[in-house]
Amino acid sequence: MTSWFLFFNNHATAQELQAKITINHNQIQGTDKSVFENLQQTLEQFVNERQWTNLKFQKNERIVCNFNITVTKYDQSSNAFTCTALIQANRPVYNSAYTSTLFNIKDADFNFEFAQFDQIEFNEENIDNQLTALFGYYAYLIIGLNLDSFAPMGGEDILQRCMNLTNNAQNLSFTGWKAFENSKNRFAIINDYLDGGMKPFRQLQYDYYRTGLDEMANSPERGRTNITTALQNDLKKAHEDKPMSMLPQIWTDYKKDE
């Protein structure tokens, strides 16, 4: 852990995330736009003002993330939203202005119910609301991935909370939470990530970011060498140990331009 990323100090804030939420409702005609505006404002407030963990982040250390939600269907009578979402999180690179993509995935079943001016509540031990479950899941996943990139397996506790939330969401009548539903749903992502066979993939997060990208400012040659080694060792072993997991392919897809 570096001196620029300290969790406990007197000047730190509680909030971990700095999320921008975009609601694209161009496909929905004849509906008062205010419901979408209220949804966007409610969600940004919920994600950004909540303390998700007991960790302390400096304001400039908060994890920048984006939720781009596209509404494909809206039923005003039942307050049901049918959506897809692109979720992305970024990580700063030490001693540079560069940011690297930490996480990027499309959730094709980002469906929920929301009535205008709803006050949304979240209790991770009692998951009874799809909307808060979705954002709780991605909040814990993003924070856990971020911690893994600063210390080997550093996000274990937070990622276990993500897994617990997923298990507690099994009774929700929405797609995406069930085991074996498909290989890229929310259950599959967190279950695979915590699987013992994916430890090399988790080690990759640390080796790629902390010993690779973060080292580039001090020694570009050493940084590039460490990145190459991480890809050749960690990524290759993760694929060999758990060939059916989609995680290495998802990671490679959003890293290919880097």
Report the location of each language-model feature.
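Bacterial Sec-dependent N-terminal signal peptides
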Residues: 1-17
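Charged, compositionally biased boundary regions
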Residues: 155-156, 160-231
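Acidic/His-rich structured neighborhood in mature extracellular/periplasmic domains
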Residues: 77-188
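A cross-kingdom marker for long, charged
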Residues: 22, 206-258
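Start-of-domain marker
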Residues: 15-82, 93-95
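Second-shell loop/turn segments in exported
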Residues: 26-33, 121-129, 241
